[in-house]
Amino acid sequence: MIPDLEKDYLYFTRVVKRDLGLDLTLYKETQMKRRILSFIVKKKYITFGEFFKHLKKDALLLDEFISLITINVSAFFRNRNRWDVLEKQVIPRLLEDSRGKLRVWSAACSSGEEPYSLAIMMERSVGTRHYDILATDLEPAILKRAVIGEYQSRQMEELNEQERRSAFIEKGDTYQILPEYRKAIRFRRHDLLTDYYEKGFDLIVCRNVLIYFTAEGKHQAYQKFADSLRRGGVLFIGGSEQILNPADYGLATLNNFFYIKT
């Protein structure tokens, strides 16, 4: 066993939070510690302290580290039946209460499949210029991929033929989302655990991310999401997630995986 790695982890989480603004203690410790230890050994550092010194000086190493601690699993219209509920039941309800553009936030958007799915759906349900989508993620490299919006054919499996034809241009063995959809989305770096949350959203989509947070991390995120919704706004979460006491956050269950701000 390489000396000091285990006992230095607590110190490492403190200095990473203090100097880099990343709170690792709000992620599940066993999983996070295992991933970071593996990364440190791979990079041939002896202690967390040595690794941290290089982390502060090396921008590329920091980008790698951020990529390591973020979860980048995404797909177009993931769990399609839930998206059908969103389009046929939730969006019409939001439109009834809306006074202008629908404000939508795709939180932890990864490489862009989720916000582009939202844009495709909004285009046919709401129409051009009647919605605004903010898409955020912690990892700069993954956001760059999202902005480009280029995907392999295997990533397009959940899209039907009409969606492929209307929203993408084929480029050899890849597909790129059309410029009008890219322009409809504001991509920005954001840390769900530490950064400020914008207010007044009609819809917030954050799916299959908070399962990696501790109970305290989830509590903080759900409260901030609730505060960011307008009254009557909706939070859409993943199929492996559940808010056990939504009333604690001023929310009520609207449908499976959909919560409305009361």
From Swiss-Prot:
Top-rank taxon, per record: Bacteria
Enzyme class: transferase
Domain CheR-type methyltransferase, chain residue ranges per copy: 1-262
UniProt keyword annotations, A-Z: Methyltransferase, S-adenosyl-L-methionine, Transferase
Purpose: Methylation of the membrane-bound methyl-accepting chemotaxis proteins (MCP) to form gamma-glutamyl methyl ester residues in MCP.
PROSITE patterns in the cross-refs: CHER
Gene name, Swiss-Prot/TrEMBL: cheR
GO biological process, alphabetically ordered: methylation
Protein name: Chemotaxis protein methyltransferase
Entry EC no(s): 2.1.1.80
GO molecular function: protein-glutamate O-methyltransferase activity
Residue spans crossing the bilayer: none
Binding residue positions for S-adenosyl-L-methionine: 72, 74, 78, 114, 137, 191-192, 207-208
Catalytic function, reaction form: L-glutamyl-[protein] + S-adenosyl-L-methionine = [protein]-L-glutamate 5-O-methyl ester + S-adenosyl-L-homocysteine
InterPro entries in alphabetical order: Bact_Chemotaxis_MeTrfase, CheR_C, CheR_MeTrfase, CheR_N, SAM-dependent_MTases_sf
